[in-house]
C-alpha cells in the first residue's frame, strides 16, 4: 500500500495526519516507512539501549530543512503500529540541531475524535513536564554511541512555532 496518497492533513496546520514509523516504548530499533511501497524498513538498531517515549512519525508531503518530512512525536495511551496513520493536532515543537543541521520535532496530540484525553493540551506549556523531560532526555542521548553523530537540543517552542514548521515544510515540498 503506497503512502504517497496520504494527505498532509485535513486542515493544515491545525489538523494533520501523522504516519507512524516507530511505536512508543518499543525495542530500540529505528524503522522508516517507504513512502512508495508502504513497507516498514529497519533503518538501524540503535546503539543506545533506549526507546522512543512517544510514537514517532512524519507528516507526508512535507519537507523539513534536513531533507526529510516533518518529524512528529505523538503521545497516546497505547503504542501505535508502524505504518498506521493518526489524525492529530500540533501543540509544540522541540528545536534541535544534529550532524545534518536543523532537526525540529513537532509534538502533536490525537484529534478529539480519536481521544478526548488530550483536549486540555493546547500548547507546549500544557504538556506534562515529565513527558517533556523524557523527550528531551531521549533526544539528547539516543545517538551518543553512534560514531560521528550528535544532537543538541535547543529548547521547546509553542504551538504557533509548530504550525509554522508544518506550513513552511508543506510549502517547501510543494515548491520542490
Curated annotation (Swiss-Prot):
It is found in: Cytoplasm. This is Inorganic pyrophosphatase. Homohexamer. Substrate binds at residues 30, 44, 56, 142. Its EC number is 3.6.1.1. Belongs to the PPase family. Mg(2+) 2 binds at residue 71. It comes from the Bacteria. It comes from Vibrio parahaemolyticus serotype O3:K6 (strain RIMD 2210633). Mg(2+) 1 binds at residues 66, 71, 103. Catalyzes the hydrolysis of inorganic pyrophosphate (PPi) forming two phosphate ions. It catalyses: diphosphate + H2O = 2 phosphate + H(+). GO terms for molecular function: inorganic diphosphate phosphatase activity; magnesium ion binding. GO terms for cellular component: cytoplasm. InterPro entries: Pyrophosphatase, Pyrophosphatase_sf. Its cofactor is Mg(2+). It is an enzyme of class 3 (hydrolase). Keywords: Cytoplasm, Hydrolase, Magnesium, Metal-binding. GO terms for biological process: phosphate-containing compound metabolic process.
